[in-house]
Amino acid sequence: MKSNPTSKAVLASAMGLALIVVAAGAVSAQEAGAVKSMAVPIPTELPPGELGKVVALGRDIVNNTSTHPLSRQYVGNSLNCTSCHLDGGTNPKALSFLGVASAYPTFAPREKQTITLEDRNLNCFMRSMNGVRPPNGSEVSVAIATYITWLSEGYPVKMSLKGPFGPNSQPSLKIDPATADAAHGKTLYASTCVSCHGSDGAGVGKFPPVWGPKSYNSGAGLSQNLKLATVLKNTMPLGNPNLSDKDALDIAAYVNAQPRPRFVLREHLGKSK
């Protein structure tokens, strides 16, 4: 099966406002000392044969999660994996997938247990995608994990002792979340974000919704102001990130103060395979 690369507009939709999704999330300032970007080339040539077809399928699902015939049944909003993991997860500063497979299995504080890469991917469907968890071992699950593993070629295997963070994770902003000013964030949103994401947060064209019924739910990582602010600082405005730490935090506080689906775990677990 050949991949169906998304247009730049679709990739641009990856505002980084949308969910946290797979293991390449932001880390704390303390953790950042041990997490440095690695100069490993991004793979471009697919493996031969059936394996390459699965990698291509995973890439297609990552770029078109909400509409792909295999994954759309598990998605409850209008977001795609690439809405947060820019450029199909290949942007090293935007919740990158690069090298992520090398950090698993790892202990996940949120789940209070050791999880695999597959577990981490599937949990994102429940939170960032406001959908249901695909079964372990399903075609969707295997394809996404295979794609991320392909993007991890060349990275040494080193299980993360700090949680589900890949080697290109960006450090959390060194700012007190309690200083967030949502009123100031509203002003900044109107001048900086509204042209792509709309005054109602529903997204414009191919740009993703950042609040409302089609955005991430309250259980997503980016529903936490500091995590969202870190993503905004590194990626927004798209193509020219220039926000100060405080402005990023204020925008995050405003966005997360708006209505969004409430996360109730039992409603998102799905069925076992």
Q: Across the structure, where does each feature detected by a protein language model lie?
A:
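Acidic helix/loop microenvironments that form the catalytic cleft of cell-wall polysaccharide enzymes
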Residues: 82-85, 147-148, 250-259
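Repeat-solenoid scaffold signature
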Residues: 238-250, 257, 263
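An amphipathic alpha-helix signature
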Residues: 114-122, 141, 145, 222-233, ...
